[in-house]
């Protein structure tokens, strides 16, 4: 059984929400073991990438550190400390002494080299299966300007993750969120964007008005969000590169909010309140008339498309309490999918199409959870004073959300967790953070 198949089988088992804990069924030594629901991370060796030019030493070390952080941050990989190395990789082209790496129980070995040539940074890497004594696939090379070194590191980590698990990675992605300062009764909010790991934070709006619910377009180039700058909620479209923005058409006396793109990138759905009623509407992102999709005498909000664009999941209190429903993308009969105790909200469809993530309030606690599209196999992943606003990683294996602490200060912090409820981790931001939206992989 190949390295990829052995490891991927085990990873799928630990990441599967719907299988009992198992032990990876293979006799080979290269595997991730799962015993009684506990994962044994894959040990890997990562020597500092070789500097092929004199001015590349510092950036080579930085790239190596980011790759290690990406992989270990998943909870699926464990880095072997360099002090344990028996031999070093003298150059990128040098033959690999597999016995030395096997002796320290490394199951994977990652080597690489970095060169700076004028205004171009070149990064190349190779991945080796230590126990079979073979390279996994061909080496890859990425190029960018020197200030793009973090993206190059994320691209290498994505490639390693993909080759070992057989699934796409999520490291070369970004997150837009609401940056928050001040106390609860005087909170200032502005849009911010960052790398998935909290690096390279940039602010997209000022704090002169409240902003809510930023949502990426499918290509990651535009952001929908709600702003109160006119005194009532209105939806805006922001270009990520130019920072140019425009407000969507709105009628006097209406409030529009909770926007989200359809998979085609041209259609949006949102909630619109008028005449005491709140329903879900659809319109072209470039403007035009809006089509009403729901008409129940209740509050209908937080719509999210299925990956194929044929269905919409949303929240509604039409049954008397806040619950989740699925309807055709063109409107029509909706079916309820949440039936547990408590209230459900902020549903978002997994990019894999198999699950819906949601916020649940029950017995004085808030949870982030997932369920299947028929409402079965609900699992709560977190619990705290206030967890809300889930968003999916590009590969559908990790969820980011915001958590607010109790008290007058009530600082909101971003967290991530995998779909089994393991590997709960804070995402560091300069200020408080809420309402995240995860981009697709960058191009």
UniProtKB/Swiss-Prot annotation:
Gene Ontology biological process terms in this record: cell division; protein import
Localization per Swiss-Prot or TrEMBL: Periplasm
Record GO cellular component, one term: periplasmic space
Annotated signal sequence range: 1-24
Any one Pfam family match given in the protein's UniProt record, by short name: PD40
Region (Disordered): 424-443
The entry's keywords: Cell cycle, Cell division, Periplasm, Signal
InterPro entries: 6-blade_b-propeller_TolB-like, PD40, Tol-Pal_TolB, TolB_N
Family: Belongs to the TolB family.
NCBIfam families in the cross-refs: propeller_TolB
Subunit structure comment from the entry: The Tol-Pal system is composed of five core proteins: the inner membrane proteins TolA, TolQ and TolR, the periplasmic protein TolB and the outer membrane protein Pal. They form a network linking the inner and outer membranes and the peptidoglycan layer.
Protein's job: Part of the Tol-Pal system, which plays a role in outer membrane invagination during cell division and is important for maintaining outer membrane integrity.
Name used for this protein in its record: Tol-Pal system protein TolB
Gene name of the record: tolB
